[in-house]
């Protein structure tokens, strides 16, 4: 049985909002996240432009560039609470470079972010391999190709 999810899906200022909204129907975002969760969760997903993504990455990670996904995890028990911020232009560019659909890449990054929210990380090579395997298993259950 899938876990309970309270989801807030937000779209910031975007150059092509219809493209990104179309790739992220609420019911699919909820499904992707629930498959990655091991407990109930309250998650906010915010889709942002390069400027907002870069500001958040700079302010919170001290890295002055926009990245694909940022995870702000607040609690892991008894309920996972987190904000996942995805930078739409970075996600779109990566999808194009990797030969993926925009929706497929968003699904992967949401799974990736949800795992981070539950304490998974990929700083050490061994941890990265374990996390990538978990992501691949979840993506396969969702009907997607191996993202790696």
UniProtKB/Swiss-Prot annotation:
The catalytic activity of this protein is classed by the Enzyme Commission as: 3.1.-.-
Location (main, coarse)? cytoplasm
Q: Which domain of life is it from?
A: Bacteria
Note on how the cofactor is bound = Binds 1 zinc ion.
Q: Which cofactor does it need?
A: Zn(2+)
Keyword terms of this UniProt record: Cytoplasm, Endonuclease, Hydrolase, Metal-binding, Nuclease, Ribosome biogenesis, rRNA processing, Zinc
The record's section on PANTHER family has: ENDORIBONUCLEASE YBEY, CHLOROPLASTIC
Q: What is this protein called?
A: Endoribonuclease YbeY
**What organism is recorded for this protein?**
Albidiferax ferrireducens (strain ATCC BAA-621 / DSM 15236 / T118)
């Amino acid at each position: 049985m899938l876990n309970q999810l309270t989801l807030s899906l937000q779209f910031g200022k975007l150059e092509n909002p219809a493209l990104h909204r179309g790739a992220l129907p609420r019911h699919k975002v909820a499904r992707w996240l629930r498959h990655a969760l091991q407990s109930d969760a309250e998650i906010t997903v915010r889709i942002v432009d390069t400027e907002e993504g870069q500001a958040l990455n700079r302010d919170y990670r001290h890295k002055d560039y926009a990245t694909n996904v940022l995870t702000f995890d607040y609690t892991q028990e008894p309920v996972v609470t987190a904000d996942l911020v995805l930078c739409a232009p970075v996600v779109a560019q990566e999808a194009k470079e990797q030969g993926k659909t925009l929706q497929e890449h968003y699904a992967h990054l949401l799974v990736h972010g949800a795992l981070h929210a539950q304490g998974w990380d990929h700083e050490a090579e061994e941890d990265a391999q374990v996390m990538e395997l978990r992501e691949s298993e979840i993506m396969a259950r969702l009907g997607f190709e191996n993202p790696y």
